[in-house]
Amino acid sequence: MRHGISCRKFSRPTAHRLSMLANLAVSLIRHERIVTTVAKAKDLRPFVERLVTVGRRLAKKDPVRGRRLLLSKMGGDLDAVNKLLDVLAKRYARRPGGYTRILKNGFRAGDCAPIAIMEFVDRKEGEPKKVAEG
């Protein structure tokens, strides 16, 4: 029975699934908006929310520890960690949570999978228009 299980398996081993979530999180942090399936977006949301919360809390209190922790969770991508600590942590300093939103966006042409746009809340419209495919 599946009591208390909160994540999907995506027919992947655990390491592959965690790597996929880390890659999606890095893409979301870099571009601030990605297009992916609804199931992946729903699994990605708590992962990214935790990363932003850790970055927000440790940006001032213990930046070295925060940077190392985020590097381990995000696959060692230093540019994304720097953006998270320098830009996003300051943007959401007063926000207690709910940093992302999921917008349903129809179905994919090849396999009719439900597609969603995942983006950060309070994102300026003048910021990057490019949408990363995930």
From Swiss-Prot:
<dbReference type="GO" id="GO:0022625">
    <property type="term" value="C:cytosolic large ribosomal subunit"/>
</dbReference>
<dbReference type="Pfam" id="PF01196">
    <property type="entry name" value="Ribosomal_L17"/>
</dbReference>
<dbReference type="InterPro" id="IPR047859">
    <property type="entry name" value="Ribosomal_bL17_CS"/>
</dbReference>
<keyword id="KW-0689">Ribosomal protein</keyword>
<dbReference type="InterPro" id="IPR036373">
    <property type="entry name" value="Ribosomal_bL17_sf"/>
</dbReference>
<keyword id="KW-0687">Ribonucleoprotein</keyword>
<comment type="similarity">
    <text>Belongs to the bacterial ribosomal protein bL17 family.</text>
</comment>
<dbReference type="InterPro" id="IPR000456">
    <property type="entry name" value="Ribosomal_bL17"/>
</dbReference>
<dbReference type="GO" id="GO:0006412">
    <property type="term" value="P:translation"/>
</dbReference>
<dbReference type="GO" id="GO:0003735">
    <property type="term" value="F:structural constituent of ribosome"/>
</dbReference>
<protein>
    <recommendedName>
        <fullName>Large ribosomal subunit protein bL17</fullName>
    </recommendedName>
</protein>
<comment type="subunit">
    <text>Part of the 50S ribosomal subunit. Contacts protein L32.</text>
</comment>
